[in-house]
Curated annotation (Swiss-Prot):
Comp. bias (Basic and acidic residues): 713-722
Enzyme Commission designation: 2.7.7.8
Homology family: Belongs to the polyribonucleotide nucleotidyltransferase family.
Organism: Rickettsia peacockii (strain Rustic)
GO molecular-function terms, A-Z: 3'-5'-RNA exonuclease activity; magnesium ion binding; polyribonucleotide nucleotidyltransferase activity; RNA binding
Protein name: Polyribonucleotide nucleotidyltransferase
GO cellular component: cytosol
Upper lineage: Bacteria, Pseudomonadati, Pseudomonadota, Alphaproteobacteria, Rickettsiales
Catalytic activity entry: RNA(n+1) + phosphate = RNA(n) + a ribonucleoside 5'-diphosphate
Length: 748
C-alpha cells in the first residue's frame, strides 16, 4: 500500500531520518522527519496557476507545535490549538528566510509549507528539524526550488562550540546561533550572544555551516528518488523589453534616484510606472507584453541604476559613501509619566521607546511544549502605517513586528541585571515613528537609552546597525546603515547589535544564492566600527544608568519568611493576602522558597503591607507586650486578637489586678487593650494577661523576654516557646522599614 522511501544519517550522535511516501501522500511534497523522540511532518503544496501582478513570491510558511506532541491538552476554554504563538511565528520566519531566495525569480505560484511537530523531544532542536523538513518537502514538490537548504544550531560552552545543544545546555551557553545554508554558502544567521567578538561569531557560523553538510546530502538522495517533475519556468521578461524601457526612461529614473529625500524620491519614482505602461498600452492590448512583465523589467532597471552607482562610483542614493552613518539625534526623558523614555533618530528612521516597571505578577506567562515559564523582560516592537506615510488601519502585531521585536529582545537581554539585582519585571515598547531602513536596530538603540534613563543597571549601552550588500560577480560593496531602497534592491540585510565589548545579537538574510565567509568578515568588521560610532553619539546624551528610578516607578522590597508561614499569609482561599492587597494598595508575590516580594506605588502603601505581613508571620514570644483587640467576651474571660490573625485567651483572673464580678464589666467587644503573652496551654493556644501589662514597656516589636509560666493549672506540662527561637520574619531584612524600601539605587 505504501511506497515509503527513507534516508538517514548519524548526525551529532543521533540518527536523523527523512522519509516520504507514507503520510500525506496527496501533498506535492511531504516528508516525515525523525530524530530522537521528535517527529515532524513537513508538507509543501504548490498552486497550479501563477499569481501574477503581486510583485513577490506568494510563499506561506506555517510552523505548528501540537500540544499532544508533549503529552499535553491545550489550556484555555477551547481545548484545541488556536492562533499561532510568538514561538510558532518566529520559527515560521526562521524557515522562510533561507528558503525564499532559492526559488526561480519568475515563480509566482501560491506555495504553502506546513511543518507540524507531532512528537516532541527536548533533547532535539525541533526548529532545526523544521527547516530541514521544509527544504526536503520543497525538493520533492514541483516548485522550482533551485538549491537544497539545511540548518544547525550552535552553542558555546566552556570555550567549545557545541552542535545542536539541548535546552538544558543552552541555559549555560554563551551563544544561541542558528545557521542555514546550501552546500556552497550561508543563507541565514540568527543568534543571541553574550558579548562575543566578531572572530568568535564568524568561527561559530563556519562551525555550523560545516556541520549540516551531511544533511544536505541525504535530502539530495531523497529528492533523486522521490521528486516530482519541476515546473518549467520562462524568463521574467524579454531582454528586448528591458532594453526598450532603458532607452526611453533611464534618464528619468536616474533623476528620481538622485533625490535624497525619501518622500520626494518615492513620489517621483511612483509616477514612472504609469508612464511606462501608457507607452506600451498597444503591446499590452496585443498581449505582446503583460503588465507584470513591464513592471518587473522596470524594477530591474531601477535596481541596476542603484547598484551601479554603488559599485562603480562608491556613491549611494543619499550621497553617502559605503561606510558613512546617517546623522544621529538622541533625546531622553521626553515622556514625563513614563518610567523611562527615549527618542532615537537616525536619518529618516526614528523610534520612540518607553520603559515600564512591573511586579513579578506582571511577567509574561508562556505556555510551550517544554512547559509553562515566565518572561521577566518583554519588548514590543510596533510598526504603525504612518511611519511610512501609508493610509492603513492599525492591526494586531504582524509576523514582521513579532520578529523584529524578538531580534531587539535578543540584543538587549544579555546586558540586563538579574532579578536579585533588579527585582522588577520590565516592559519596553518601541514604536517606529519614521522608517527608512533599519528600524529594528533603531529600536535597540532607543531601548538602551530608555532603560538607562529609567535607572535599570544594565551592564553596558547597546547599539545596533544594519549592513547591506551589493554584489556582482566577484565585485562587491558592503553598506553601513542601509536605507529602505538599499534593503529592497540589495543582496543582504545583515543586522549586528552589541556593546563596545562584543556582539549580543546577529541576524543575516540573503537575497542571492548565498555569501562566502570573506564577505561576512568584511561586514562584521564594518559593523563593529559603525556600532562604536553610534555608541559614541548615544554616550553624549547618557552613558550609564541613572542612580535613581523615576518617581513614578513602584516601590518594592523582597523579604524572606519561613516556608511554613506562607499559608498563613495566603489564608483560606486567598482571603488574607487579598485583604492585605486591598487595604494597602500593594501587590504581593510569594515564591515557594519563602521569598515575599511586595510592590506598591509609594512608600506608605509598602509600609502598610509590610506591617500586615509582619504581624502574620511574627512568632510571638513569652513576655512580649501587644496592643490587642477584644473579639469575644465570655463569663470565664475574653478572647483577644493580639497580633496578626492570632487570638489568645485572658482568664477572668488576669483581666484586672483587682477582683471583678464579671468580665463584661471591664471589657467589651472591640476594646483596644495592652496584653502580655504569659504562656501557651497544652494545645498551643496563647495565654494572655492584662494585669500590669500597661506598666511594662509597650511595643509590638520589643525583644523577647524569658518568662516562667506561673499558671495554676499544673495538670499538664507547660508548652512554652523557646525564647531563643528566631522569628519567622527576617529582622535583617527589616532593620527599619525605611531601609528596606527601595531607595531606587541598585548599584553595588
Amino acid at each position: 500500500m505504501f511506497n515509503e522511501i527513507t534516508k538517514s544519517v548519524t548526525w551529532n550522535g543521533q540518527v536523523l531520518e527523512l522519509s516520504t511516501g507514507k503520510i500525506a501522500r496527496q501533498a506535492d511534497g511531504a516528508v516525515t522527519v525523525k530524530m530522537g523522540n521528535s517527529v515532524l511532518l513537513c508538507t509543501a503544496v504548490v498552486a497550479n496557476k501563477a499569481k501574477e501582478g503581486i510583485g513577490l513570491l506568494p510563499l506561506t510558511i506555517n510552523y505548528r507545535e501540537m500540544a499532544y506532541a508533549a503529552g499535553k491538552i491545550p489550556g484555555g476554554f477551547f481545548k484545541h490549538e488556536g492562533k499561532a504563538s510568538d514561538r510558532e511565528v518566529l520559527v515560521s520566519r526562521l524557515i522562510d528566510r533561507p528558503i525564499r531566495p532559492l526559488f526561480h525569480p519568475a515563480f509566482v505560484n501560491e506555495t504553502h509549507v506546513t511543518c507540524s511537530v507531532l512528537s516532541y523531544d527536548p533533547e532535539t532542536p525541533v526548529d532545526i528539524l523544521a527547516i530541514i523538513g521544509a527544504s526536503a518537502a520543497l525538493s520533492l514538490s514541483p516548485a522550482p526550488y533551485l538549491e537544497i537548504v539545511a540548518a544547525s544550531k550552535v552553542g558555546l560552552i566552556n570555550g567549545e562550540f557545541v552542535l545542536n545543544p539541548t535546552l538544558a545546555l543552552l541555559k549555560t551557553s554563551q551563544l544561541d546561533l542558528v545557521v542555514a545554508g546550501t552546500s556552497g554558502s550561508v543563507m541565514m544567521v540568527e543568534s543571541e550572544a553574550h558579548l562575543l567578538s566578531e572572530e568568535q561569531m564568524l568561527e561559530a557560523v563556519k562551525f555550523g555551516f560545516e556541520s549540516f553538510q551531511p544533511v544536505i546530502k541525504i535530502i539530495k538522495e531523497l529528492a533523486e528518488e522521490a521528486k516530482k517533475p519541476k515546473l518549467e519556468m520562462q524568463a521574467l521578461y524579454p531582454a528586448s523589453l528591458k532594453k526598450e524601457i532603458e532607452k526611453l526612461f533611464v534618464k528619468e529614473i536616474e533623476q528620481a534616484f538622485a533625490i535624497k529625500s525619501k518622500q520626494e524620491r518615492s513620489t517621483n519614482l511612483d509616477l514612472i510606472p504609469e508612464k511606462v505602461l501608457t507607452h506600451f498600452v498597444s503591446d499590452i492590448e496585443n498581449k505582446k507584453y503583460s503588465n507584470y512583465q513591464i513592471e518587473s523589467a522596470l524594477k530591474a532597471i531601477e535596481s541596476d541604476i542603484l547598484r551601479n552607482e554603488i559599485l562603480e562610483k562608491n556613491r549611494r542614493i543619499d550621497g553617502r559613501s559605503t561606510t558613512d552613518i546617517r546623522q544621529i539625534a538622541c533625546e531622553i526623558g521626553l515622556l514625563p509619566s513614563a518610567h523611562g523614555s527615549a527618542l532615537f533618530t537616525r536619518g529618516e528612521t526614528q523610534s520612540l521607546v518607553s520603559t515600564t516597571f512591573g511586579t513579578s505578577l506582571d511577567e509574561q506567562i508562556v505556555d510551550s511544549l517544554e512547559g509553562e515559564y515566565k518572561e521577566r523582560f518583554m519588548l514590543n516592537y510596533i510598526f504603525p502605517p504612518y511611519s511610512v506615510n501609508e493610509a492603513m488601519p492599525m492591526k494586531a502585531p504582524s509576523r514582521r513586528e513579532v520578529g523584529h521585536g524578538k531580534l531587539a529582545w535578543r540584543a538587549i537581554n544579555p546586558i540586563l541585571p538579574n532579578k536579585v539585582q533588579f527585582p522588577y519585571s520590565i516592559r519596553v515598547v518601541a514604536e517606529t515613528t519614521e522608517s527608512n531602513g533599519s528600524s529594528s536596530m533603531a529600536t535597540v538603540c532607543g531601548s538602551s537609552l530608555a532603560l538607562m534613563y529609567a535607572g535599570v543597571p544594565i551592564k553596558a549601552p547597546v547599539a545596533g546597525i544594519a549592513m547591506g550588500l551589493v554584489k556582482e560577480g566577484k565585485n562587491f560593496a558592503v553598506l553601513s546603515d542601509i536605507l529602505g531602497d538599499e534593503d529592497y534592491f540589495g543582496d543582504m540585510d545583515f543586522k549586528v547589535a552589541g556593546t563596545s565589548e562584543g556582539i549580543t545579537a546577529l541576524q543575516m538574510d540573503i537575497k542571492i544564492s548565498g555569501v562566502d565567509f570573506k564577505i561576512m568578515k568584511v561586514a562584521l568588521e564594518q559593523a563593529r566600527l559603525g556600532r562604536l560610532h553610534i555608541l559614541e553619539q548615544m554616550n553624549k546624551v547618557i552613558s550609564k544608568p541613572n542612580n535613581e528610578l523615576s518617581k513614578n516607578a513602584p516601590s518594592t522590597t523582597t523579604i524572606k519568611i519561613d516556608k511554613d508561614k506562607i499559608r498563613d499569609i495566603i489564608g483560606p482561599s486567598g482571603k488574607v493576602i487579598k485583604e492585605i492587597c486591598e487595604t494597602s494598595g500593594a501587590k504581593i508575590d510569594i515564591s515557594d522558597d519563602g521569598t515575599v516580594s511586595v510592590y506598591a506605588s509609594d512608600r506608605d502603601k509598602l509600609k502598610v503591607a509590610l506591617d500586615k505581613i509582619k504581624a502574620i508571620v511574627v512568632e510571638p514570644e513569652i513576655g512580649e507586650i501587644f496592643n490587642g483587640t477584644v473579639v469575644k467576651v465570655l463569663d470565664s474571660g475574653a478572647f483577644i486578637n493580639y497580633v496578626g490573625n492570632k487570638d489568645g485567651f485572658v482568664h477572668i483572673s488576669e483581666v484586672s489586678g483587682e477582683r471583678i464580678e464579671t468580665v463584661s464589666s471591664v471589657l467589651k467587644q472591640g476594646d483596644i487593650v495592652k496584653v502580655k503573652l504569659i504562656g501557651f496551654d497544652n494545645k498551643g493556644k496563647a495565654k494572655l494577661t492584662i494585669k500590669n501589662a500597661d506598666k511594662d514597656k509597650s511595643s509590638n516589636n520589643t525583644k523577647p523576654k524569658t518568662h516562667v509560666n506561673n499558671t495554676k493549672d499544673n495538670s499538664e506540662p507547660e508548652q512554652r516557646r523557646d525564647s531563643s527561637k528566631k522569628r519567622a520574619w527576617n529582622e535583617d531584612n527589616n532593620a527599619e522599614i525605611a531601609e528596606v524600601i527601595t531607595e531606587r539605587k541598585y548599584f553595588n
